[in-house]
Amino acid sequence: MVKWSELPPEILHLISLKIDNPFDLIHFRSVCSFWRSSSLLKFRHMTSLRCPLPLDPGGCGDDCHILSSRVYLLKCPNRDRPQYWMFKLQAKENGEVVLHSLFLRRNSSAYGCLYPSLSIDLLNCQIFELAQEHVACYSEWFELFECISKCEERIGFMGLNREKNEYMILGKLSFNGLAMYRSVDNRWTELEITPDSFFEGIVPFKGKFYAIDRTGKTTVVDPTLEVNTFQRSRPCDKTRKRWLLMTGDKLILVEMCTKSRYDFHIPNIREKKIWFEISELNEERNDWDQVEDMDGRVLFLEHYCTFSCLATEIPGFRANSIIFMDLWGGSNSYELESILVYEFNEKGVRSLRDKLEYIELFPFPPGWVISNG
């Protein structure tokens, strides 16, 4: 059997070209000196994908591009006490990579800790990719104020062929309803759906896009632009907010509920009488089936990104809990008070400050990560 270190250099180089994660490339290059000399020197972050919108009356929209981010979990088990950190890396329009604080909408420049001033010992730490985020950024002309506004919108993103840079995007953006952008066509196509719907979640799942609006209607869009819609068989009139996310091979609907709209708008977080309901997509019946358990997972409902991980991955985390952002503006959006926790067993909302075992996961960045070297 041929030794790994004796693989032809051209094959090693081709393999390194197909690695789409910067930390995986570092691990690949660390196998031996021959692999390092035969592979990419460093990960090549691509400039933002462009998807120009039709020009609006103010001549805006042709600058539309996609900002891509990845969420990582860093584990450092070789210390006196295992430590963990969850963070986001965002590739800017010019390909520059910026460190972002998860849930707190600020980047490394705002914090005063410029990337790449962090040094991570990958020999003694493990890094896992938890999720990817894609956001459409574009300019829009506001006739009322006669000014240009910079907009960010959640989208669904589906990569088709990485080598040929082929992809599809589904979003509302400046359109009346949903529209799809296909890179092979290099244009947007508006879908024939009810206009002026506000979509609370858009995700790709098994080769299709799923979007849900604030009425609870689910829209399914095929790459061929075929559109189907369905309402759940048991609608809930208590739902105030919805999220979609994938957990393993399942598509999950998360609904925040209150008995009345007044309860939803109570400013004091501790007095909020809210609860969450979880449902799984039933593809055969085009319906959402409510479930009582989240398979031991913790759900993260971020501004543009939703994802999950097993509670056993992080000691101290409790299964069947949800971490989400303050939707009511009752706290400082740049502080940990704006990150909230809901646990199904306790039936109540708390600030992250009240859950000491969770706090260490989100500082920006924790002191043990920063290197002065």
Swiss-Prot record:
Q: Which domain of life is it from?
A: Eukaryota
**Transmembrane feature ranges:** none
Q: InterPro entries from the entry?
A: F-box-like_dom_sf, KIB1-4_b-propeller, SCF_F-box_domain
Q: Does the keyword Repeat apply?
A: yes
Q: Which SUPFAM superfamilies match?
A: F-box domain
What residue spans do the Kelch repeats cover?
A: 165-207, 262-308
Secretion signal span: none
Name the UniProt key words of this record, in alphabetical order.
Answer: Kelch repeat, Repeat
Query: What Pfam families does the database record attribute to this sequence?
Result: Beta-prop_KIB1-4
**Domain F-box intervals:** 2-50
What name does this protein carry?
Answer: Putative F-box/kelch-repeat protein At5g24040
